[in-house]
A protein has these predicted regions:
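NAD(P)+-binding Rossmann beta1-loop-alpha1 motif at the extreme N-terminus of oxidoreductases
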Residues: 2-54
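Conserved beta-strand termini and adjacent loop/short-helix elements that scaffold enzyme active sites
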Residues: 32-34, 51, 62-64, 123-125, ...
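Helical "substrate-binding/catalytic lid" subdomain
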Residues: 183-258
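Residues at the starts of beta-strands that form the adenosine-phosphate
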Residues: 5, 28-30, 97, 119, ...
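Rossmann-fold dinucleotide-binding core
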Residues: 109-188, 195
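Active-site-adjacent beta-strand anchor residues
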Residues: 8, 31-32, 76-77, 101, ...
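Short, charged/polar "capping" segments at the starts of alpha-helices
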Residues: 37-40, 106-109, 161
């Protein structure tokens, strides 16, 4: 293993989980936090549940980020509405690669206009969970079949840093996939998750929404509409839908509409 310095910018559920996993794998792991979360981390450290035990991660906790504090990879794990503030804060830092683990359809050019061309590596996390009232992380990676950590160069080309990032994830036992068009992948991802989220919020009993036929039918109709719309546009511009998730979506959804 090549020793890498990693900064996690954002200490919510996603950032905290990746920080814990990178630290377990032996990487020089640092996490940047603010406000109450920073105070909690400084007082108690980053604690997380694993196999019914509470473990304290071996990481460095930061409340500020000097420009000359350089990392091999900076993982940006903030909410979308915090993205531009974070990019502005990172623009003068000398680290070369910022992995934007954010669900956003904004133009990557806008991000590069802030931090500089060639620094952005778009990505999407594969994890979920919560932080309880005691500040203890209870989270897990999503299975590879459902949602691996996904990333790509903006150009779609392979690069030395995508190879290095793959190795980091592999060594930390984090499922991942490299795609050729991250923006297209996120479009497809939203086409799927928005109808599912709508079903959750429309139900009076979200935990058993799968038993509500009317909502499930509406969800299937929305999914089919989204995929057909995406497919028609992508066909028009000569692109290809990501194969791992979207092969022949209309046929499978037709079964749910009968």
């Amino acid at each position: 293993m090549i020793l890498m310095r990693i900064l996690i910018y954002g200490a919510g559920v996603i950032g905290s989980l990746y920080a814990a996993l990178f630290a377990e794998a032996g990487y020089d792991t640092n996490i940047y936090a603010r406000g109450k979360r920073l105070e909690a981390l400084r007082n108690n450290g980053l604690k997380y549940k694993k196999n019914q035990e509470v473990i304290k991660a071996e990481i460095r906790i930061l409340g500020e980020l000097p420009n000359d504090d350089i990392y091999d990879f900076v993982l940006l794990t903030v909410r979308e509405n915090q993205l531009y503030e974070a990019l502005t804060e990172l623009k003068n830092n000398k680290s070369n690669t910022i992995v934007t683990m954010i669900n956003s359809l904004d133009s990557y050019n806008k991000w590069e206009d802030i931090v500089g061309k060639g620094r952005i590596l778009p990505a999407f996390p594969g994890a979920g969970g919560s932080i309880n009232d005691d500040g203890i992380l209870d989270a897990a990676l999503t299975p590879r079949l459902i949602q691996p950590t996904t990333f790509a160069e903006i150009s779609g080309n392979k690069s030395e840093r995508t190879k290095q990032f793959s190795e980091i994830l592999r060594h930390a036992h984090i499922p991942y996939q490299k795609v050729t068009d991250m923006h297209l992948w996120q479009l497809c991802h939203l086409a799927m998750v928005v109808p599912i989220a709508d079903a959750y919020y429309e139900s009076d009993n979200p935990e058993k929404v799968e038993k509500e036929w009317k909502i499930m039918r509406k969800t299937a109709e929305r999914l089919k509409r989204n995929f057909n719309f995406l497919g028609s546009i992508i066909f028009f511009v000569g692109l290809t839908l990501p194969r791992y998730r979207f092969s022949k979506p209309s046929a499978s959804l037709d079964m749910n509409l009968r």
